[in-house]
């Protein structure tokens, strides 16, 4: 689909659809493929969602969000619009919309993420600041998650050259409180980005979305001090899935804060000790990132030439088989379909209805688990 500016009504429909409680990125694009527009998807949503407690926000509620955003100077960018970042369109599934507050031109520069431990050592924070400053001087925008430690050091050091803070909550929600001054400074001189609406306070389930945006906005991810079980390594995994460069600074084997970095290097991540190491890794990175199609062809079950009752009966049987194959451990969609034996087109229709009715939980990267 060609990029274009959405009308006020179209933007309202996109926001209503994506703000529906059980509509994540996978379901959003499934509905767009099936019905062709957010307006048509909203018209048919009640037939797909059998739970009476799940309904789209009203037009009035979304218009209030749009008015509040405009009043604050926040823009809501939908994935088809020209100012939506190209690198984020190469993520699968594409985040349907993002809220941005600040200097959006920073997304048009080449971006690199610098992430790491909240409880970082003094030397780790010094290294993050040094790398961020030198990469900023080389023309890169620095992306991070506005957390304590490595994130804060990277943001502060690149404030004059360009930095983007990605949040799990709304762009107006300051978290952690220790970073209040940094957050306020970034509104004026940097850029804040989130998939969440204004005023929203993040929960644990929102941070994977934030992490996926951090890697999605960036050509590569630099990891400085990360424990073996940390959100930082989740971001590194997303970067690999998005075909982005993963780089890590080595550390002492006696420091638990660097065990995750050392493991990444052992698994094939690039070892970096200087900003030049990062520049060398990113030299050809842009050519490796290909945009994703916004609208893949609909499955046969999205436009099936059968009676509605027959199609629904087949979908219901497929749902039972897919649910039996699912577990509480997130599983890749292709593996779930293969184990269930359900044909791919029928499985796509069934999984869409299952997500909309909260029978399954679909991670931001598309992996599926029982709710």
Language model regions located:
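Short, small/acidic-rich helices and loops at N termini and domain boundaries
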Residues: 1-83, 357-359, 364-371
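Glycine-biased, small-residue-rich flexible motifs in mid-sequence functional cores and linkers
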Residues: 1-10, 78-371
């Amino acid at each position: 689909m060609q990029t274009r500016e959405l009308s006020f009504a179209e933007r309202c429909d996109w926001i209503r659809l994506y703000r529906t409680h059980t509509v994540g990125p996978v379901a959003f694009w499934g509905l767009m493929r099936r019905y062709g527009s957010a307006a048509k998807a909203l018209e048919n949503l009640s037939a797909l969602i059998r739970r009476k407690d799940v309904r789209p926000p009203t037009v009035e509620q979304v218009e209030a969000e749009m008015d509040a955003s405009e009043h604050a100077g926040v823009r809501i960018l939908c994935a088809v619009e020209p100012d939506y970042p190209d690198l984020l369109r190469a993520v699968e599934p594409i985040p349907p919309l993002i809220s941005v507050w600040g200097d959006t031109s920073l997304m048009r520069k080449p971006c690199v993420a610098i992430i790491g431990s909240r409880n970082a050592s003094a030397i780790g924070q010094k290294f993050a600041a040094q790398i961020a400053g030198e990469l900023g001087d080389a023309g890169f925008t620095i992306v991070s998650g506005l957390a304590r430690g490595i994130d804060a050091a990277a943001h502060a050091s690149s404030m004059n050259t360009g930095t983007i803070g990605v949040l799990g909550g709304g762009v107006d929600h300051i978290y952690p409180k220790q970073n209040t001054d940094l957050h306020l400074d970034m509104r004026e001189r940097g850029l804040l980005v989130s998939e969440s609406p204004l005023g929203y306070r993040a929960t644990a389930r929102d941070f994977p979305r934030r992490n996926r945006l951090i890697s999605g906005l960036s050509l590569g991810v630099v990891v400085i001090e990360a424990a073996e079980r940390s959100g930082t390594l989740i971001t590194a995994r997303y970067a690999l899935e998005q075909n982005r460069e993963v780089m890590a600074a080595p550390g002492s084997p006696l420091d638990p804060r660097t065990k995750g970095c050392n493991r990444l290097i052992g698994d094939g991540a690039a070892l970096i000790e200087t900003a030049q190491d990062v520049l060398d890794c990113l030299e050809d990175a842009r050519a490796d990132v290909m945009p994703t199609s916004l609208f893949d062809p609909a499955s046969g079950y999205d436009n099936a030439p059968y009676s509605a009752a027959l199609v629904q009966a087949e979908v219901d049987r497929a749902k039972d088989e897919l649910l039996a194959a699912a577990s509480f451990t997130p599983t890749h969609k292709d593996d779930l379909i293969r184990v269930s034996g359900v044909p791919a087109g029928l499985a796509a229709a069934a999984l869409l209805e299952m997500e909309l009715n909260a029978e399954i939980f679909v991670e931001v990267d598309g992996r599926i688990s029982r709710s």
